[in-house]
Amino acid sequence: MDTILQFDHSLIFYVHEHFVYSFLTPIMAFISKITSNGALWIIIALLLMLQKKYRVLGVAIIIALGFVFIIGDQGLKPNVARLRPFVDFPNVTVPLESALPKATSYSFPSGHSFGSFASAMTIYLGLGQIAPQKRYLGILALLGSIVVAFSRVYLFAHYPTDVLTGLELGIIVGFIAWKLARIGWNWWTNRHNDVEYEPYTFKRK
């Protein structure tokens, strides 16, 4: 445990001392804000659900975010009850105080990281089967999730292991969510076998 804490403290202070710049802070704050509570991913999911071809993918993202809420917000956070770095180190000057969450909220795991990687992995897997030529968008989503995770450490809102755990859990949840969405699609299409759909879509052939 001491080794993990030492790693966390060393890395977050390294980022704080070597990567914080005045021009970068508002960018990190904006990225963090638009992904708070899964907002960006919910919007993407709703937009996908408006299209028959990508409706199943949109549902899968909502499933993933549901797991994130149950496992992260309702399960791990209150039970682990890890304090945030800016609470542990109140004398540190954070990049932007207004970008910080409530001091009473817990740090482990990072909800931003968990939700972003769960959604991005779902998008990557879904596009790989629905529209393989667009799988690169899933890769971009995963790369964007790395930036989201970094923004949380940058802003002194999370320790590195908070976001790394969010990454790992998010990838697992993404796999599960897409699997469940496929099962749901198979169940639906088997009930309506008089209509032939393109794989994992509601777009008729």
Model-derived segments and their meaning:
Residues 62-71, 75, 168, 172-176:
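Hydrophobic, lipid-facing residues on alpha-helical transmembrane segments of integral membrane proteins
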Residues 14, 45-49, 149, 153:
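Solvent-exposed, amphipathic alpha-helical segments
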Residues 18, 22, 50, 54, ...:
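Membrane-interface elements of multi-pass transporters and channels
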